[in-house]
Amino acid sequence: MNFDCQAEHRLNQQGTVTPSESLPVPRPLPRHGNGFRTLINGLIFLGVLALSCLVLNRRLPYPDIPTAGEKIRYLTLHGREYDTLFTGSSRVNFQILPSIFDQTLAAQHKRSKSFNAGILGMRPPEQGFYLEQVLRQPHDRLRWVFIELTSLEARTPKSRTGSARFAYWHDAARMGLLWTWCQGEWAALRTASGAGQPSSMEERWEPLSVWLGHVPPFLRRSVNLGRASYLAEQWVLSAPERAKQRNKWRALGKDRDGWMPSGSPEVMNAQDRAAYQESYEARLAQPARHFHDPGSDAAAQAMLEAVTHSGATPIFFVPPMTSEKIYYPPAELAGRMIIWDFSDPRRYPELFEARNHLDPIHLNTAGSELFTRILAQQFAEFSQ
């Protein structure tokens, strides 16, 4: 009896033992794979995002960039009608008249229907991107593509860097061209250093800072930022109504062949005439100095390959101008290209008469008509 009382007393002192207290509580295992799984999930997300952007980019039409977008849309509808295209800057847009080009060839019993796809201020890398978009449009009859030969412009003026036009051409291929240009700038600095002209840190940083300035528009273009409005238009407007609103054809000229007059005064004022005369006499005394660089060379080669791959023949040309320096490819590349140089005032004196110029690098309407006839005549002789 005493034994039972003592046992009961000990149990009361220890308290009641529940099943949960009688078993050890398992500790959670350390989650060593969290960082790896996060990385994998992040990569999957980026991959899906990139694929979605790529599919959407192919689904969306050419951006509605002034002049460029309109010419692309017009070629989408009428590209099969043309056998000859002209591409380049204002020295194409305002200086080559397809109507006169075709008439000059017709007088020599050669059929031609040409279109001026030039755009004000267009230079590589933008020129190559735009050319590739032109060549993606229907072009069953296309045989010849005239391309203005000019250098790559990497240092874009700040006044243009915030525009939609600046952003639209920044794809991976163009970023590659800009990187080639950057490497060329560094190589030039190393060459100068080897010749006793050491470069500063600021000079070495500048090419990279220029390239980095092109990264934001590349990213905006890659994710199709700001282009959802087109998809909204598709849901709200019928195809005919959408075409009616977008296709005004204001940039195509009265003949809808892509040529328009520049709108500048047709005659130089006294100050401009004096400046032109000075540059003209300098070119008579000494021809323009040719230069080339890796970025411009790569851009020219890419355009050469793009046109050749499309089944057409590229003809590069240098317009009539009195600039001190003119881009011209190195001999190895130039040997694979057709290049017509109209920048020599001794060979083409009529193209350099002051009455035919707006300024040292642009012709007026009369000069443009003359240049178009000379271009067509040379083409007629070449294509015999």
Outline where the language-model segments fall:
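N-terminal Lys/Arg-rich, disordered targeting/topogenic segments
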Residues: 1-36
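Hydrophobic membrane-insertion alpha-helices, especially the h-region
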Residues: 37-58
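Alpha-helical transmembrane signal-anchor/signal-peptide segments
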Residues: 58-80
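Short hydrophobic beta-strand that contains or immediately precedes a catalytic carboxylate
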Residues: 85-88, 363
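Secreted/periplasmic serine-hydrolase-like ester/acetyl group-modifying domain
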Residues: 162-302, 306
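Active-site segments of SGNH/GDSL-like serine hydrolases
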Residues: 301-327
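C-terminal regions of proteins
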Residues: 326-384
